[in-house]
Amino acid sequence: MISHLLPTTSLTIHMPSIILYPIYFDKSRPRRFRCVPKDKAILNPLAKNIADVVRDLGYKCKLEPLKTHPADWVNPGRVEMVLPEKIQKKYVINEIAKVLLLRPTVKTDPLSLPIQNVPARLPENPPAYPKGVLGNTILPLHSPALSGGGISENMFQEMMQEMQKQPGLAGGMNPMAALAGMGGPAPPMPTPQASSSQRKQKSIEPEYDLDLE
């Protein structure tokens, strides 16, 4: 059943607020991405489900289905929640996590968030990830891993470049390390091709970049 969330265009939040991304509650992610312990996290969290829980707990919020955490590019969506006075962010997140544990994500949940110009039906194929990357198996219908046959190499490269600009990656962490936190090894970094003249020279340890060929 589709809940009546406040549309993103009709709610302007002037009070103190917090941003909630699905990755904060994702059991498959390393601790540096989660905001709750692993035993309080779930598999395949969705922003729409988080928004439903926030509303059911009595808080005001707006769902932003197109906003994406830099380390969770396949799972678009986030929730902006009004944080009442004298309520701490940690307390709210733990309360949300408790309810999410009682409402594990199911395959049909993405249908509860219709997206314009996206067919309201479950995908026939599983999410498509770049080689060597594992990820969530239940995603919003507008996930780039479900549309157009999956993530193209060009799109993947653009995402990597965008992640490098994001301050949300602790300590300037390499975005490849962020992808490694998706439950599988990061895609192998390409080795630059040496010219014939370079092959004759003494081998030198190559520098790696993010250009995926």
Swiss-Prot record:
Keywords: Cytoplasm, Nucleus, Ribonucleoprotein, RNA-binding, Signal recognition particle
Organism from which the protein derives: Schizosaccharomyces pombe (strain 972 / ATCC 24843) (Fission yeast)
Subcellular location: Cytoplasm; Nucleus
Name of this protein: Signal recognition particle sec65 subunit
Annotated region (Disordered), positions in chain: 176-213
InterPro entries given in the database record: Signal_recog_particle_SRP19, SRP19-like_sf
Effects seen without this gene: Leads to sensitivity to camptothecin, thiabendazole, microtubule depolymerizing drugs and DNA damaging agents.
GO CC terms in record: cytosol; nucleus; signal recognition particle, endoplasmic reticulum targeting
Alphabetical list of SUPFAM superfamilies matching this protein: SRP19
Gene behind the chain: sec65
General function of this protein: Signal-recognition-particle assembly has a crucial role in targeting secretory proteins to the rough endoplasmic reticulum membrane. It must be involved intimately in the translocation of a wide variety of protein substrates.
